[in-house]
Amino acid sequence: MPDSAPEPHVADQAPQDNELTDYDREHFPTYLRLLDAETEGADWGEVARIVLQIDPSREPDRARRAWESHLARAKWMTKHGYQHLLRGG
């Protein structure tokens, strides 16, 4: 069985551009996982640890900021970013 691709490195802050970025394209699966976790009512700390690979017990502020910014970006993708994908961007 082939190994799955490694998770891409997660920045402390997701992009805030009004355009789709290379980071967004690379982290599209991460955004989907964050949206799924929110829908399921998962604890933010557990999501940060599992999805973003940041331990909230060791780095609570960093974990919270990364989770908040990436979840906000995931929501942006559902409202605006997907349009850039449809246009081939």
Describe the residue ranges of each PLM region.
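Charged, low-complexity regulatory segments of eukaryotic nuclear chromatin/transcription proteins
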Residues: 80-89
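C-terminal accessory regions
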Residues: 2-5, 38, 55
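Basic, low-complexity segments
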Residues: 1-18
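Major-groove recognition helix of helix-turn-helix-like DNA-binding domains
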Residues: 33-34, 57-80
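Short helix/strand-capping connector loops at secondary-structure junctions
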Residues: 13, 49-62
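Short, charged amphipathic recognition helices of the HTH superfamily
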Residues: 40-50
